[in-house]
């Protein structure tokens, strides 16, 4: 039953972004585990390199949904947790941003980790405005305090939002064209300035691939 429900959900997500669900291989395991692969092609890609000082940093959605969902699971509020885990793939927004973005990636390893990865690839730094970072309302409801809320929002990961850098002169156009609201959270600075939030260094913590 769990597998059938998963396949139904996977097919629905694929249909929403005009992709085709192909199938996969099955094996036995002590718990229900899914490993997915997406295959596609683009005319011109936007990678992690290319951000330049003066570009604006924009993100989609709100951060901390998955962190909040896990806490709701721990409280056995399963319906709320499952709702929070329902993400909309940002395919259309990615296509829109591709027309202007100088660098882009997703936030699945955490916003902080993504910013550091972009900074390393682009040989730049970032000056982020903490108050501008959009945080999920659900996280505010379960966080212990302001610092716990911030930690979960930027370091937990699994939010699957886009993080991109855009020339300042193109920002308004991208906001108007994007099917998903874009939030400006900071700007690109010189490499020697590092990655900071309100002038303080932002730790490079998030999901680490083994």
Regions found by a protein language model. Give the residues of each.
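Haloarchaeal acidic low-complexity proteome signature biased toward cell-envelope/secretome components but also
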Residues: 67, 72-81, 87, 97, ...
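Active-site-proximal betaalpha loop/short-helix elements
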Residues: 2, 85-157, 189
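Short hydrophobic/aromatic beta-strand micro-patches
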Residues: 39, 163-167
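Glycine-rich anion-binding loops of enzyme active sites
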Residues: 1-69
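Short, conserved charged micro-motifs
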Residues: 45-46, 169-176
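Active-site glycine-rich loop that binds ribose-phosphate moieties when present
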Residues: 37-47, 78-96
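Acidic, Ser/Thr/Pro-rich beta/coil linker or hinge segments at domain junctions
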Residues: 176-210
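Residue-level signal for inorganic ion chemistry
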Residues: 21, 54, 106, 164, ...
């Amino acid at each position: 039953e769990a597998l059938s429900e998963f396949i139904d959900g996977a097919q629905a997500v694929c249909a929403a972004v005009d992709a085709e669900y192909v199938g996969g291989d099955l094996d036995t395991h002590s718990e229900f585990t899914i490993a997915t692969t997406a295959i596609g092609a683009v005319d011109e890609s936007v990678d992690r390199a290319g951000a330049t000082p003066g570009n604006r940093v924009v993100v989609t959605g709100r951060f901390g949904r998955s962190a909040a969902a896990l806490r709701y699971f721990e409280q056995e509020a399963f319906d709320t947790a499952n709702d929070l885990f329902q993400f909309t793939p940002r395919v259309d927004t990615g296509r829109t941003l591709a027309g202007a973005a100088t660098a882009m990636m997703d936030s699945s390893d955490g916003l902080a980790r993504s910013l550091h990865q972009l900074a390393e690839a682009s040989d730049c730094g970032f000056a982020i405005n903490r108050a501008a970072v959009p945080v999920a309302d659900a996280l505010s409801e379960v966080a212990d305090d302001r610092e716990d809320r911030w930690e979960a929002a930027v370091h937990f990961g699994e939010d699957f939002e886009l993080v991109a850098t855009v020339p300042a002169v193109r920002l308004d156009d991208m906001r108007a064209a994007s099917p998903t609201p874009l939030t400006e959270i900071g700007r690109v600075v010189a490499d020697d300035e590092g990655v900071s939030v309100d002038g303080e260094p932002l730790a490079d913590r998030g999901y680490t691939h083994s």
